[in-house]
């Protein structure tokens, strides 16, 4: 079993590209290599050691095109994630998984009606899952919707 790290190595978007509203001058975007603390896992969460993460047009939109993110920078982009669960929910430890790009709350009336794709409280790594995204070596995520790769 993999050793649980104290820190997550990550590439964080600290400044998206933009334009100064007063001068019109272009503001260059910044990605910075950082180390952030591994948070204490809550019940029902898993820590995934990232094997790979795709670069999606959504990530490019956040960085280059001014598309707003729910969590304001600094944050780690990346939501097309695969990896191995190393801690947390015992059903998944040691399993290779795909982390869904969007995770519903599974508790609201919309989810309970089977329409979790329409959930108003959904979370997305690299946007609305706090500062955590797939462009890192580990990511804490809700375990409930992980997809085991066989």
Task: Report the location of each language-model feature.
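Short, Arg/Lys-rich segments that mark the N-terminal edge of DNA/RNA- and chromatin-recognition modules
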Residues: 1
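Short structural boundary motif marking the start of a folded domain
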Residues: 4-11
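A generic structural signal for well-ordered coil/turn residues at beta-strand boundaries
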Residues: 6, 32, 42, 93, ...
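Residues in well-ordered beta-strands of folded domains
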Residues: 11, 61, 98, 140, ...
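N-terminal glycine-rich cofactor-binding segment
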Residues: 12-40, 57-87, 96, 119-132
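Glycine-rich beta-strand-centered segment in the early N-terminal region that forms part
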Residues: 37-53, 66-112, 145, 150
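NAD(P)H dinucleotide-binding glycine-rich loop of Rossmann-like/cofactor-binding domains
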Residues: 105-150
